[in-house]
Curated annotation (Swiss-Prot):
Catalytic activity: ATP + H2O + closed Cl(-) channel = ADP + phosphate + open Cl(-) channel; chloride(in) = chloride(out); hydrogencarbonate(in) = hydrogencarbonate(out); ATP + H2O = ADP + phosphate + H(+)
CDD domains, alphabetized: ABC_6TM_CFTR_D1 (cd18594), ABC_6TM_CFTR_D2 (cd18600), ABCC_CFTR1 (cd03291)
Domain ABC transporter residues, every copy: 423-646, 1208-1441
Biological role: Epithelial ion channel that plays an important role in the regulation of epithelial ion and water transport and fluid homeostasis. Mediates the transport of chloride ions across the cell membrane. Possesses an intrinsic ATPase activity and utilizes ATP to gate its channel; the passive flow of anions through the channel is gated by cycles of ATP binding and hydrolysis by the ATP-binding domains. The ion channel is also permeable to HCO(3)(-); selectivity depends on the extracellular chloride concentration.
This protein's name: Cystic fibrosis transmembrane conductance regulator
Free-text description of this protein's post-translational modifications in UniProt: N-glycosylated. Phosphorylated; cAMP treatment promotes phosphorylation and activates the channel. Dephosphorylation decreases the ATPase activity (in vitro). Phosphorylation at PKA sites activates the channel. Phosphorylation at PKC sites enhances the response to phosphorylation by PKA. Phosphorylated by AMPK; this inhibits channel activity.
Residues binding ATP 2: Y1217, G1242, R1243, T1244, G1245, S1246, G1247, K1248, S1249
Extracellular side: 99-122, 217-222, 320-339, 882-917, 1011-1012, 1116-1129
Ranges of Acidic residues composition bias in the record: 1468-1478
Database matches in SMART domains: AAA (SM00382)
Numbered residues of crosslink Glycyl lysine isopeptide (Lys-Gly) (interchain with G-Cter in ubiquitin): K688
Length: 1478
């Protein structure tokens, strides 16, 4: 970054913002880069500001029992705030003085007041000077207040972040990530936007008092008639604001429904295409869109009338103020024009400035109180350690995550005779109820000496991770003692990668030791992976390590923990994402050899690890089930395996037991309004559900940490359009709304871009507390259905290295992986996409082509615009005719002039006043929009409807290769933020711009006709305005975009820190991350400060141009007007009106250009390539001579009920994810017989899922695949995919009923659906729910276990009558019971079908008749598993002893003595950990 010219700027340069000229020139000539941005002044640095506020806050905490954050802010910023307020008031006072001089100038042209004619020129000079003084005072004052608001935001940002790193884990469980983001974005934005408005809470009343005093002098008591009208108008606007809130609340629920479905569709676009559900999803989303648009139009109309009320009030307030006085006493023309000028200022003060100020104070004080409450929450307490201690010891430890019993726990406990609830992920949603009010750890005691390995085992939710948290100090014991040295290293269960290089992630701030570093890399088997990267270990990893596979991330996390030299190493299931072979090698080389002399506590579920441990601790429901050596375990606890596997699943309970659990669980659903649950005498009577299934429940029953708080299946449709707040004490919408959100802020005030302003929605998954964020896997770590090698296509996103900037390393690492609009709760995987926006290939300024294309989307829009222009021409024409009539009348009056010196309202001169009434009435009709505004707003919303439909169709038809280059968040932003702009902001902004620009043009025409000389001044002014706007816009839009990009790292860094908070604390890296956060803040500040400064430069230049114009008009009017106070009055009044209106029009034009960028982005998506059927290959075969007709309607397919057998032939298949990318599979050929069951094997990332995707034509493929002799080139794409049944690894359950999820097209009867549900073992599950098939699933089927979701996918395949079934690792997250159900269903329902099963566990493939092994992009075939195991020893090592005995019975002796069977503990899977407590 360059040094800022501000540092060396003189007073005048600072006053006129001339120091910004270099960046404006640079931005006009070429595209700006981050390196062009100036460094921030030291007074704006986050370090300086945070230290200042933190010192005052600490002082406040120390001195008072009830500390107030506002006191700390007052001590930091009060006097500057007062100083700028006084300057702002002096600038506003000039507005009240201007009408006095205007009145004197008009009076000087009275025929009977020739004495003052000589001083008219001096009065004109005075009037011009007032405008100059106002310009010189207002702009520095407003900029100073914005600058101070920015500094307050920065200081509070830092304070909140530092507090977040100190929060206790208990508090983190009660705060969602969405609330933290809301705290840092919505609430703090109020300082940026509103501080300049805050002073009007006292300036506006003073203005009103001053103006009413001046009006009393003119009109006496009748002046209060105008004020009364304005007060009524303000109340009317407040009422309209409340009405709009109601519409918005209702509409927010509908938007939420649509966006939830859209989000689910985008996230699962592979599944949508695989199931051929494009039309079904389009229909569902469009139906929701229709309902939403009805409310959108109502909201727009209310906002339109609210906006219009300000315009039409001008005429009425003058009319009501003047008419009573004129009827009683008569009135002279001077008083009329003076009153008009006074009322313009009075109207702004009463209807705009004061309501805005009150709203600003209400919102700001509310934000300060929220931040104050947050800053006083309980902090993490560092335990006292003894550095000389070598042992690790616990004595009778008991600990709670959260005290207090919930009603649900009590009732569930009463319904269970032994008071114990099974603890695994084998039921619907009832796991861990027993942990609700009970200790997470009970009476735990153990002792391990230096150098020993303690293996901790237990079922999911037994308290294993809680044990490590206790040792780290994250969980405070309520009883007992802990003893260790305090020198700890920690490896989280779910790998955490910070933005940075591979080396930085491993070293993590510890001093670099080359030998140790190389040893750790080698032990963690990272050498080979690192060597493949072009930059080796200096390769930059995006947030979360998106470019790495799950196994690579796990190994880097493990390497980080081992590299640190510590006394005690806590390893929380570090091998969860490694294949069996890699896990075995790393355990040996790393845990057993490299760390042999260190004390280690390893959480594991593997029998091999237990055998090699010095001590074993097995936990069950928080208690010590066993502690000792492995030799003791076999003799003392022979049943430990079956006990901890948790076979007591939901499906094995009695019907009464299941009904009881389900009843109690559903009873906790907080259903609002008509979505209530009624229960009668313990039996489910009814369960009404509205269509608002998109409204997601707030909390998860599955998380016992959250289970004492209510959640809802269908929330009330309250939504905060501009935020993501959740507060139990107040509704999502603010309680006070004097002005609608779109109306807040004067036109000259910049809008902060710290958060997107589109409507937000509740995302795809259940509410995430911060603790859940830390204790659940990153979404990257799920093995996606379609992935390849190291380039995981996760959410269709990749981060090309070439996109990374060269300036701010940390910021560039953070900013590239983010995006997505979510509402009141934002989920962890959505946060990184929350602030992302796709801006590539979008020009800095909206092109004329975009405007033209937008206008021609809807034919009616062209006619409406022509209609608006016709009405405008009629108005201007009528005004000119009126002027001509008045002029003619005036000439006649001069010839018959009388000695009447008392110009009452019925005099000839009052004809000018009648003309003003005429113009006012015309403007009133214009403002009301009876002929112009409403049709325009209505048509623009229709345009938005069409664009949404076109974009939805385009996205659904786009090939998967397109999605591999787009982010899910970027796509969803088009449907959320950009469509919201098209719905809400753009119609009203275009209306305002059209209205304002026509008012200005009309006024200019009238002024020019009244005084033709003025027209000569008008032309250069208009040219100067157009050139200046074009000059500024080119730079400002680029600065705005750079600011938007710089905003991303702030929030991404917060989420990254939260995800790795336990690791940060264990390594003591909080100061380092605070420094990185300040760096991200400073980067954003540099962009935002420069944008504010250039905007003020532009606003000031615009005002200087029109002050010049007003001076010219004033002097021309004074010098060329003879006897005729009417004409000079009209000229000067209209010129002053132009002054106040034109700047508003200029800002509206900039807003329109900025909002039209959303239209550009939407058009970019509409223009995406379409997924087309592959062209047929030229061949001599008769069946392929139908050319294009063959693709549309294949006769062979139609007549023979294709496919009839399911025989597949693959010839020379090559698959790539993107055009020009590396081939994942190359020249693969094999054949599969009809009805054969084929196993697909390979290590993680070898291409198993890729091959399944290639079968479905989801990738860029070459070669040929035939089904029953029919080539894929000769079959329509949809029909080809319908030949396959699919059970993807990433299960797709969308928000809707069971019926919709099974049969979205509504093709099957209830009898068929129940029959299939029974076949796959779903019937008993569905019957438990009220409404049965019509029960609405929300939040991706959150009330179902992963196994039940897999069964739904299986049922879809059965209903599809497919002859070929593709299964992508179906056993990955299943409990044994559900897996047995799937195996049974496969045998029965798909007995005569071809089954292709992708697995990396050989145990799951014992029943396959044939095997395909993928290695190095090639496929090898094996006819039997015995042959596979014999030839591939690596796979043989992965088979358990019991399975080996089944495969090779001849090798086993019957003379072996039987002994107690010991099997491995059930592996904890990603889904289980998500749905259970620590």
């Amino acid at each position: 970054m360059q040094r800022s010219p501000l540092e060396k700027a003189n007073v005048f340069s600072k006053l006129f913002f001339s120091w910004t000229r270099p960046i404006l020139k640079k931005g006009f000539r070429r595209r700006l880069e981050l390196s062009d941005i100036y460094q921030i002044p030291s007074c704006n640095s986050a370090d300086h500001l945070s230290e200042k506020l933190e010192r005052e806050w600490d002082r406040e905490l120390a001195s008072k029992k009830k500390p107030k954050l506002i006191n700390a802010l007052r001590r930091c910023f009060f006097w500057r705030f007062v100083f700028h307020g006084i300057i702002l008031y002096l600038g506003e006072v000039t507005k009240a003085v201007q009408p006095l001089l205007l009145g004197r100038i008009i009076a000087s042209y009275d025929p009977d007041n020739k004495a003052e004619r000589s001083i008219a020129i001096y009065l004109g000079i005075g009037l011009c000077l007032l405008f100059i003084v106002r310009t010189l005072l207002l702009h520095p004052a407003i900029f100073g207040l914005h600058h101070m608001g920015m500094q307050m935001r920065i200081a509070l940002f830092s304070l909140i972040y530092k507090k977040t790193l100190k929060l206790s884990s208990r508090v983190l469980d009660k705060i969602s990530t969405g609330q933290l983001i809301s705290l840092l974005s919505n609430n703090l934005n109020k300082f940026d936007e509103g501080l300049a408005l805050a002073h009007f809470v006292w300036i506006a009343p003073l203005q009103v008092v001053l103006l009413m005093g001046l009006l009393w002098d003119l009109l006496q008591a009748s002046a209060f008639c105008g004020l009364a009208f304005l007060v009524v108008l303000a109340l009317f606007q407040a009422w309209l604001g409340q009405m709009m809130m109601k519409y918005r609340e209702r509409r927010a629920g509908k938007i939420n429904e649509r966006l939830v479905i859209t989000s689910e569709m985008i996230d699962n676009i592979q599944s949508v295409k695989a199931y051929c559900w494009e039309e079904a999803m389009e229909t569902m989303i469009e139906n929701l869109r229709q309902t939403e648009l009805k409310l959108t139009r109502k909201t727009a109309y209310v906002r339109y009338f609210n906006s219009s009320a300000f315009f039409f009030s001008g005429f009425f307030v003058v009319f009501l103020a003047v008419l009573p006085y004129a009827l009683i006493k008569g009135i002279i023309l001077r008083k009329i024009f003076t009153t008009i000028s006074f009322c313009i200022v009075l109207r702004m003060a009463v209807t705009r400035q004061f309501p805005w100020a009150v709203q600003t104070w209400y919102d700001s004080l509310g934000a300060i109180n929220k931040i104050q409450d947050f800053l006083q929450k309980e902090e993490y307490k560092t335990l006292e350690y003894n550095l000389t201690t070598t042992d690790v010891m616990m004595e009778n430890i008991t600990a709670f995550w959260d005290e207090g019993f919930g009603d649900l726990f009590i009732k569930v406990k009463q319904s269970n005779s032994d008071g114990k609830i099974p603890n695994g992920d084998h039921g619907l949603f009832f796991s861990n109820f027993s942990l609700l009010g009970t200790p997470v750890l009970k009476n735990i005691s153990f002792k391990i000496e230096k150098g020993q390995l303690l293996a901790v085992a237990g079922s999911t939710g037994a308290g294993k991770t809680s044990l490590l948290m206790l040792i780290m100090g994250e969980l405070e014991p309520s009883e007992g003692k802990i003893k260790h040295s305090g020198r700890i290293s920690f490896c989280s269960q779910f790998s955490w990668i910070m933005p940075g290089t591979i080396k930085e992630n491993i070293i993590f701030g510890v001093s670099y030791d080359e030998y140790r570093y190389r040893s750790v890399i080698k032990a963690c088997q990272l050498e080979e992976e690192i060597s493949k990267f072009a930059e080796k270990d200096n390769t930059i990893l995006g947030e979360g390590g998106i470019t790495l596979s799950g196994g690579q991330r796990a190994r880097i996390s493990l390497a980080r923990a081992i590299y640190k030299d510590a006394d005690l190493y806590l390893l929380d299931s570090p091998f969860g994402y490694l294949d069996v072979l890699t896990e075995k090698e790393i355990f040996e080389s790393c845990v057993c050899k490299l760390m042999a002399n260190k004390t280690r506590i390893l959480i594991t579920s593997k029998m091999e690890h237990l055998k090699k441990a010095d001590k074993i601790l097995i936990l069950h429901e928080g208690s010590c089930y066993f502690y000792g050596a492995f030799s003791e375990l076999q003799s003392l606890r022979p049943d430990f395996s079956s006990k901890l596997m948790g076979f007591d699943s939901f499906d094995q309970f009695s019907a009464d037991r299941r009904s009881s659990i389900l009843t109690e669980t559903l009873r906790r659903f907080s259903i609002e309004g008509d979505a209530a649950v009624s229960w009668n005498e313990g039996k489910m009577q009814s369960f009404k559900q509205t269509g608002d299934f998109g409204e997601r429940r707030k909390n998860s029953v599955l998380s016992p940490l959250n289970s004492n708080r209510k959640f809802s299946v269908v929330q009330k449709g309250q939504q905060q359009m501009n935020g993501i707040e959740e507060n139990d004490d107040e509704p999502l919408e603010r309680r006070l709304s004097l002005v609608p959100d779109s109306e807040q802020g004067e036109a000259i005030l910049p809008r902060s871009n710290m958060i997107n302003t589109g409507p937000t929605f509740q995302g795809r998954n259940r509410r995430q507390s911060v603790l859940n964020l830390m204790t659940r896997p990153s979404v990257h770590q799920g093995q996606g259905m379609y992935r390849t090698g190291n380039a995981a296509v996760r959410k269709m996103s990749m981060v090309p290295q070439s996109q990374l900037s060269e300036i701010d390393i940390y910021s560039r690492r953070l900013s590239r992986d983010s995006g997505m609009d979510i509402s009141d709760e934002i989920n962890e995987e959505d946060l990184k996409e929350w602030f992302f926006d796709d801006v590539e290939n979008i020009p800095a300024v909206t092109t004329w082509n975009t405007y033209l294309r937008y206008i021609t989307v809807h034919k009616s829009l062209i006619f409406v615009l022509i209609w608006c222009l016709v009405i405008f021409l009629v108005e201007v024409g009528a005004s000119l005719v009126g002027l001509w009539v008045l002029k003619e009348t005036s000439l006649k009056d001069k010839a018959n002039t009388t000695n009447n010196t008392y110009a009452v309202i019925i005099t000839n001169t009052s004809k000018y006043y009648l003309f003003y009434i005429y113009v006012g009435v015309a403007d009133t009709f214009f403002a009301l929009g009876l002929l112009r505004g409403l049709p325009l707003v209505h048509t623009l919303i229709s345009v938005s409807k069409i664009l949404h439909h076109k974009m939805l169709c385009s996205v659904l038809k786009a090939p998967m290769s397109t999605f591999s280059t787009l982010k899910a968040g970027g796509i969803l932003n088009r449907f959320s933020k950009d469509i919201a702009i098209l719905d809400d902001l753009l119609p009203l902004t275009i209306f305002d711009f059209v209205q304002l620009i026509l008012i200005v043009v009309g006024a200019l025409i009238v002024v020019s006709v009244l005084q033709p000389y003025i027209f000569l001044a008008t032309v250069p002014v208009i040219i100067a305005f157009i050139m200046l706007r074009a000059y500024f816009l080119q730079t400002s839009q680029q600065l705005k975009q750079l600011e938007s990009e710089a905003r991303t790292p702030i929030f991404t860094h917060l989420v990254t820190s939260l995800k790795g908070l336990w690791t940060l604390r264990a390594f003591g890296r909080q100061p380092y991350f605070e420094t990185l956060f300040h760096k991200a803040l400073n980067l954003h500040t540099a962009n935002w400060f420069l944008y504010m400064s250039t905007l003020r430069w532009f606003q000031m230049r615009i005002e200087i141009i029109f002050v010049t114009f007003f001076c010219i008009v004033t002097f021309i009017s004074i010098l060329t007007t003879g006897d005729g106070e009417g004409r000079v009055g009209i000229l000067l009044t209209l010129a002053m009106n132009i002054m106040s209106t034109l700047q508003w029009a200029v800002n509206s034009s900039i807003d329109v250009d900025s909002l039209m960028r959303s239209v550009s982005r939407v058009f970019k998506f509409i223009d995406m390539p379409s997924e087309e059927p592959l062209p047929p290959k030229p061949t001599k075969s008769k069946k392929n001579q139908l050319s294009q007709v063959l693709i549309i309607e294949n006769e062979h397919v139609k007549k023979e009920n294709w496919p009839s057998g399911g025989q597949m032939t693959v010839k020379d298949l090559t698959a790539k994810y993107i055009d020009g990318g590396n081939a994942v599979l190359e020249n693969i050929s094999f054949s599969i017989s009809s009805g054969q069951r084929v196993g697909l094997l390979g290590r993680t990332g070898s291409g198993k899922s890729t091959l399944l995707a290639a079968f479905l034509r989801l990738l860029n493929t070459q070669g040929d695949i035939q089904i029953d002799g029919v080539s894929w080139d000769s079959v329509p794409l949809q029909q080809w995919r319908k030949a396959f049944g699919v059970i993807p690894q990433k299960v797709f359950i969308f928000s809707g009923t069971f019926r919709k999820n099974l049969d979205p097209y509504g093709q099957w009867s209830d009898h068929e659906l129940w029959k299939v549900a029974d076949e796959v073992g779903l019937k008993s599950v569905i019957e438990q729910f009220p409404g049965k098939l019509d029960f609405v699933l929300v939040d991706a089927g959150c009330v179902l276990s992963h196994g039940h979701k897999q069964l739904i996918c299986l049922a879809r395949s059965v209903l599809s009558k497919a002859k070929i079934l593709l299964l992508d690792e179906p056993s990955a997250h299943l409990d044994p019971i559900t897996y047995q159900i799937i195996r049974r269903a496969l045998k029965n329902a798909f007995a005569d079908c071809t089954v292709i099963l992708s697995e990396h566990r050989i145990e799951a493939m014992l029943e396959c008749q044939r095997f395909l092994v993928i290695e190095e992009s090639k496929v090898r075939q094996y006819e039997s598993i015995q042959k596979l195991v014999t030839e591939k020893r690596l796979y043989g090592q992965a088979i358990s002893h019991s399975d080996r005995m089944k495969l090779f019975p001849h090798r086993n002796s019957s003379r072996h003595k039987s002994r107690a069977k010991i099997t491995a503990l059930k592996e904890e899977t990603e889904e289980e950990v998500q749905e259970t407590r620590l």
